Amino acid sequence: MTIAVGRAPAARGWFDILDDWLKRDRFVFVGWSGLLLFPTAYLALGGWLTGTTFVTSWYTHGIASSYLEGCNFLTAAVSTPADAMGHSLLLLWGPEAQGDFVRWCQLGGLWAFVALHGAFALIGFMLRQFEIARLVGIRPYNAIAFSGPIAVFVSVFLIYPLGQSSWFFAPSFGVAAIFRFLLFLQGFHNWTLNPFHMMGVAGILGGALLCAIHGATVENTLFEDGEQANTFKAFEPTQEEETYSMVTANRFWSQIFGIAFSNKRWLHFFMLFVPVMGLWTSSIGIIGLALNLRAYDFVSQEIRAAEDPEFETFYTKNILLNEGLRAWMAPADQPHENFVFPEEVLPRGNAL
């Protein structure tokens, strides 16, 4: 006689049933992260499409910003709230709009709506990568890498305006609007001379260079395992053998530079590290701008340029350009301040 000793199956509650449904194998995986990702991404994208299509920026920036007013894809935008709104969350039912949807749009409520839902959507997408990596049984480096774009978005769209007087000084959601924000950062913060911006540029362009070099090197060293014009069809995702020669690639770059990667794992970690560090460092720099921190003020050159009409450097020329950006941008960018700059205070280079 056989006696089976076992544990009675635990009763399945609503959490287990929901967990099974969320993690069911389907074309688009949902998961627990999807409860955050899909609603927030849908609302952020919908708010942006609504704003760029219908909503004016006349009451916040004194400009047209929608397709309805004649803008195109490059010039339409969801503009930041009015300067007078400060750092209000601009809830539809809050004291500013008092439930009036049209008034809420006029005050810039859609920008706050898109920015906050967009931030949570990006966080949800990173959590999605964590969740699927855990289910598949791989390490979560994709999610860690995606923290770079999240850091940039949060620092630029949320932390920077929080350090300034209001949401008004954040970037509006549009192509030309982002360009205006870049000019603003240069004119008011001398952003291109900031070392964190330099590290960010080095990281992003360095990552692009590494990507191009890596792709070209792999294509160069593919094994000739087919008779067709290209070898793409000769590859099978489940094949055991290598599809390109790391030894040949190492030999090639050793001859080019005298040094080359000999370890695929170190090579690919480096390709991950360079662009992500670029994104992180540029985010740190933006946080510095939020606090109005200065970087690289070469005062001695400015003093000498002021005293000697024949002395000028690229730095002093850029400082004059920044003064021009501030003097010409501020009246157009902040019409509510009624700035008026007389001719004698506008910047003039030494050559003039």
Swiss-Prot record:
The answer, when asked if S-adenosyl-L-methionine is one of the entry's keywords, is no
User: What does the Swiss-Prot or TrEMBL cofactor note state?
Assistant: The D1/D2 heterodimer binds P680, chlorophylls that are the primary electron donor of PSII, and subsequent electron acceptors. It shares a non-heme iron and each subunit binds pheophytin, quinone, additional chlorophylls, carotenoids and lipids. There is also a Cl(-1) ion associated with D1 and D2, which is required for oxygen evolution. The PSII complex binds additional chlorophylls, carotenoids and specific lipids.
- Listed binding positions for pheophytin a are 129, 142
Topology with respect to the bilayer:
Multi-pass membrane protein
Q: Which residues bind a plastoquinone?
A: 214, 261
Q: Where does Fe cation bind?
A: 214, 268
Q: Which GO terms describe its biological process?
A: photosynthetic electron transport in photosystem II
Its job:
Photosystem II (PSII) is a light-driven water:plastoquinone oxidoreductase that uses light energy to abstract electrons from H(2)O, generating O(2) and a proton gradient subsequently used for ATP formation. It consists of a core antenna complex that captures photons, and an electron transfer chain that converts photonic excitation into a charge separation. The D1/D2 (PsbA/PsbD) reaction center heterodimer binds P680, the primary electron donor of PSII as well as several subsequent electron acceptors. D2 is needed for assembly of a stable PSII complex.
Looking up NCBIfam families in the UniProt record yields: psbD (TIGR01152)
**What's the protein here called?**
Photosystem II D2 protein
State the organism of origin.
Paulinella chromatophora
